């Protein structure tokens, strides 16, 4: 069955434009509620937890979802502004039927979305999402008055989640003597992340912690690191941590103002775990720098590539039975700590590696040199299939033969625009650039 509404990360779009409208979101709540009701145990009544980020539209969409669930006979608990991974954790910890997050992650405030978590704190299986889509095609009705769902606030959501985050940091370590700048992107972690690090002993300077409904991700957060770099330097901090709007991704800045991306953070995590207890392998994506693949091989650590997107990294981790993965954008997964990507928890793993080793970020990454990457986007006609272009395939094979084990080629179509992305990695930047241009030229004809 073809998906009509659910993408790789729930339902998302511009507020006021289908499908992110009040009437659709109410129907979505009702459809999800009917699916939950069918699968519930005979003696139990479904209970769903709803959280949101700081977008102004969150109020409207929260009310619409609540109405839909209530009409389906599902009780609702409202957590208010909370990070996406917090809803995953609380759904599991409170033994609820499902969790729902109203967020568009790193997108601007005009966008919003709805994503679901199962009772186990994992993203919904494809089969359940398809059931919900099928239910959306049925007319919406309402259960009898005596069966309507109730709604109440979850008053201690913030405190519960703060304690959970702290529990993922080693008991024998603390952050005393560490000066941190924490950038909350004016998003869902604005009232949580600074306190987590402070309660572990750090001196915390918070920025991007004044949400007004319209400024989420604007000039702050993991997708706009300039503010963090400036604050780290101005405050002479040891480290800076930037989250995105729903706090499921991060990037880190050192005292010198250097930004460390997800590939470098994954390397640090794996290296630290190997120091404590050897691990079997780690998962990156098709875009993960080849330097990690080489380094992990030398360390005796397996490495697998997933499609781009944390959902696919998670799938491969589960298939392999591994625990650590991530992508360059800063979505990190530590399945020995949490069921989903969590920016705060991931930051704590980096901080524990620093504390345990007594080294700086620069020192922890000095033995790995990232391969230069050249990425060229080539506009094509909609529907163009590059895999049927014989000249392109021949050039790709020729370049791969010349690079050998000293580089790699990746060609993929954009999922959102009529573009073909050509990426070449090589130990030498000039070679990477030259090879990428050779391949891209075959697309430009």
From Swiss-Prot:
Biological processes annotated in GO: carbohydrate metabolic process; peptidoglycan biosynthetic process; UDP-N-acetylglucosamine biosynthetic process
Alphabetical list of SUPFAM superfamilies matching this protein: Phosphoglucomutase, C-terminal domain (SSF55957), Phosphoglucomutase, first 3 domains (SSF53738)
Protein name listed in UniProt: Phosphoglucosamine mutase
Catalytic activity: alpha-D-glucosamine 1-phosphate = D-glucosamine 6-phosphate
Annotated gene: glmM
Enzymatic class: isomerase
Family (UniProt): Belongs to the phosphohexose mutase family.
Keyword terms of this UniProt record: Isomerase, Magnesium, Metal-binding, Phosphoprotein
Active site: 105
GO molecular function: magnesium ion binding; phosphoglucosamine mutase activity; phosphomannomutase activity
GO cellular component: cytosol
NCBIfam families, per the entry: glmM, PRK10887.1
Domain of life: Bacteria
Binding residues for Mg(2+): 105, 244, 246, 248
Species whose genome carries this gene: Janthinobacterium sp. (strain Marseille) (Minibacterium massiliensis)
